[in-house]
Amino acid sequence: MIDFWCCVYASILDKNLFLKRIRFYSLLRVIVRLGGNIVLPLYFQLTAKNNSYRLSAFSKEQGRIIVTVTSFPKRIGRLWLTLESILRQKIKPDMIIVWLSKEQFPTEESIPFKLRQLRSRGIIIRLEEYDFASHKKYYYVLRDYREDHFITIDDDIIYPSDFIFSLVNGYKQNPNCVVSRYAFEMKYDLNGNLLPYMTWSMVRKEMEQTDVAFLGTGGGALFPAHSLYPDVSNIELALSLCKYADDVWLNAMLRLNGKKVVVVDNLFSIFPILYLKDFSLSSLNCHQNMNDVQIKAVRKYYEENIGQDPFAKI
């Protein structure tokens, strides 16, 4: 059921220029998105008692696969849809952790009931003191589970059933790399200068070990244990340089640590959750050129402090 909607949504491509100009494809995407956002929640509720849609008790103490996600009040009400899609994977992670801030969710009762119900099926919900925005998704898992591998997801996406399998399989074949399902190819001019973010092209096919892929954490990325530069846990520095772009920070950290990125299959088969009043960091970063501003800040800091540009052409 999930894969059907993901495939239908992914199949809508802007092939005809005229139809693109009259926004036919945009309208079609809206219709499909509305349909899926009606059908899938009903499907999830009707099948929630299936014993295969839960996590088993884990026995390993390190080397686990942990799916990590965060959310905020405007989206928390539908986060359960994202988590249902993760519970229905072909291969399941060892742990799924939701990191929330007490600044936004001061009590257990402030967490939606549907989300709290998922604890009985293995979901872990952690209330932490401070709100580090989207940086919560990696900061706390690195603090508490440093010897484990983690997969980042977003709270506004329903993931296809092969999502975790493709990332884990990519990691097994490339154990020294970070693995992603969604990335952009960074562009440089003839002199090796990094071009603006809006000129980068989306990666539409698999890429073997590469230095030019800028991964997106929301589309799904697997970070092996110890794959990131030690500064990754310096949350004050991260927030001062790129508060609204955990993607920028994590890409810088993997590059400073000498890691390459592998982009695996099926990059577009995700299904967006519909929110009536949505706020997207990706929209803010793209439309206001904030990605360029934050990338520039990160480059400047590391050039001045360690003499290395994390986004230099290699």
Locate predicted features:
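C-terminal catalytic/acceptor-binding lobe
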Residues: I2-L46, L237-I314
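Hydrophobic targeting segments
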Residues: G63-V69, I86, D94-L100, D247
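Active-site beta-to-alpha loop of glycosyltransferases that engages the nucleotide-sugar donor
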Residues: V69-L81, I91
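Short, acidic, metal-binding catalytic loop of nucleotide-sugar glycosyltransferases
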Residues: T82-D94, Q117
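Residues at the starts of beta-strands that form the adenosine-phosphate
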Residues: D94-M95, H149, K260
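Active-site-proximal specificity loops/subdomain of glycosyltransferases
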Residues: S101-E147
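Conserved catalytic core of nucleotide-sugar-dependent glycosyltransferases
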Residues: V141, P160-E236
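Short beta-strand-to-loop acidic/aromatic patch adjacent to the donor-nucleotide binding site
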Residues: D148-I158
